[in-house]
Each structure stands twice: as structure tokens, then as C-alpha cells.
Amino acid sequence: MNPVVCAFGVIFVVVTLELVVAHPGKDVLGCHNGTSITVDECCAIPMLANKTVIEKCKAAHPFKPPQNTDDKGPRGHPGECIAECIMKGMGALKNEKVDGPAFRKAIEPVVKANPAFAKLLDDTVKQCHESINVDSEFTRYVTKPVCKADAKAFINCVYGTLFEQCPTNVWTQKDGCTQLKDKIKKGCAYFALRKHGGRRMRPT
């Protein structure tokens, strides 16, 4: 790996981890500031995972306050466990790593039913899979959490990219939608900009 790229990656990961640790539960990037609209209202991205799998995983990993508040023990977020569970249910997580080709195979019915997203989904899955593989190399020495963050990062990457490049015939020209694109480009997670209780997979 190029030493410059490696060094940049390490710096990025360290800074990101410091932000997360130093500001637990805070909206560091201002993702919710001045936002009155949700991503659901701007681009109707199809549900990629089976609804039964999603509901089963949400029931198995409910959102609740962490038991450890003394910064001891493994760190984790229920969203990471839900995402990991969903990816396993889709057969897209093998040996604790995201399997891009398996994910693409699992969403084939969705691709066929949504031709507007077909080409975009192919490119997005490949791009996000490659990105997650690089990030995993940089973070593999971090203290092991309850659930790996790779699955959650991959799903957020896929949906975030689909939103940023939403097909014109699906995109809704509403005030605030372009602002949401800018927020995602800045680093806000797609699922952090969704409505609560939505019908699609929600790992954050």
C-alpha cells in the first residue's frame, strides 16, 4: 500500500475515533442542524434487505442505553449489531468480513424490480466494498467491539451513495434535499438523516 495513503488513512481513523469517543451522543458534524426534511422524502431508495430479516435483527438488538458507563469493556452500538445481523441474514458477511459479491447476489430481485437503480447499485456495491476493505485494514488493531462496525459502514455507504447519485426520475425537487446531499458528503450517515420508524433497514 502507498505509504502516503496509509498514513492518511491512519490519521483519518484516529481523528474519527477521537471525535466519537470525546463526544458520545453529540451531533459533532451538525447533521441535524437546520434540517426539516428527511432523505426518505428526497429519494425513494428501494429496501435492499428482506423485511423479515430486518425485523428479526431489530428485535434481537433493541436500542437501549449501554450498561457500561465507565468507559470499561468493549464499545458498541446497537446499530452495528443490527447491521451485522442483517448482513449475515443476507449471506453477505463471511468470516466477519463484508462479502460484496454475495451482497450483490442477495439484492438481485431488488435490482430487477428497480431498473432505475440497476447500474448505480452495481457500481455502488463495488465501490463501498473496496472502501470497507481498506478501512478494515486501518482499524483491525482497535479494541474489538461487541459487533464489528464494517457492516454498518458498508450499508451506510451503499445508501449514502445511492442518495447522492439518486436517478433524476426518482429524485424529488424539495427544498432541503440538496442540503442533505451536502451533509452526507460532509460525513453524516445516511440513516442519521432518516425518519424514525422507517420501513427500510436502519442500522444507526
From Swiss-Prot:
Pfam families: OBP47_like. One of its GO terms (molecular function) is odorant binding. It is found in: Secreted. This is General odorant-binding protein 67. Its main location: secreted. Keywords: Disulfide bond, Olfaction, Secreted, Sensory transduction, Signal, Transport. Present in the aqueous fluid surrounding olfactory sensory dendrites and are thought to aid in the capture and transport of hydrophobic odorants into and through this fluid. PANTHER family: IP02236P, ODORANT-BINDING PROTEIN 59A-RELATED. Disulfide bonds join 57-85, 81-147, 128-157. Residues 1-22 form the signal peptide. It comes from Anopheles gambiae (African malaria mosquito). It comes from the Eukaryota. Belongs to the PBP/GOBP family. One of its GO terms (biological process) is sensory perception of smell. GO terms for cellular component: extracellular region. The gene is Obp67.
